[in-house]
């Protein structure tokens, strides 16, 4: 039987890795490779070797979409597990909205995550959306 199809949204994921030691140049390189200016959100896994102040400032200056970033002991790069550098992932879709929340210190993370999830569920109920759509 002939069935009408409805177009679905496409999720585009781009991955990049840099070993550039200068935070500003590393973030600029990743932003270009990830096409971050058009992304719905960006995830960054950063080596603890970067000074966090300059790294955070470079991210805020360069990537103007929501970013979730963390330090990591190592990242999966083009050559497998690597130490140093930054690995990034950009996600782009008309159906995706990313809302980062600071979880600090991490020992408070669980209770903060529960509070955030409850607030998102409350907002979803108020706007008659499913919680999964809001949390996604």
Model-predicted regions and their roles:
Residues 3-136:
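Cofactor- and metal-binding active-site motifs of prokaryotic enzymes
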């Amino acid at each position: 039987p002939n069935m009408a199809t409805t177009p679905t949204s496409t999720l585009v994921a781009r991955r990049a890795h840099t070993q550039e030691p200068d935070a500003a140049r590393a973030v600029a390189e990743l932003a270009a490779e990830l096409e971050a200016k058009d992304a719905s959100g960006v995830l960054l896994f950063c080596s603890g070797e970067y000074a966090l102040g300059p790294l955070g400032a470079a991210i805020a200056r360069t990537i103007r979409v929501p970013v979730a970033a963390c330090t990591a002991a190592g990242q999966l790069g083009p050559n497998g597990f690597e130490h140093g550098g930054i690995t990034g992932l950009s996600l782009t879709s008309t159906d995706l909205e990313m809302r980062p929340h600071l979880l600090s210190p991490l020992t408070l993370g669980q209770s903060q995550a529960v509070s955030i999830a409850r607030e998102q569920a409350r907002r979803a109920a108020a706007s008659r959306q499913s919680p999964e759509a809001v949390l996604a």
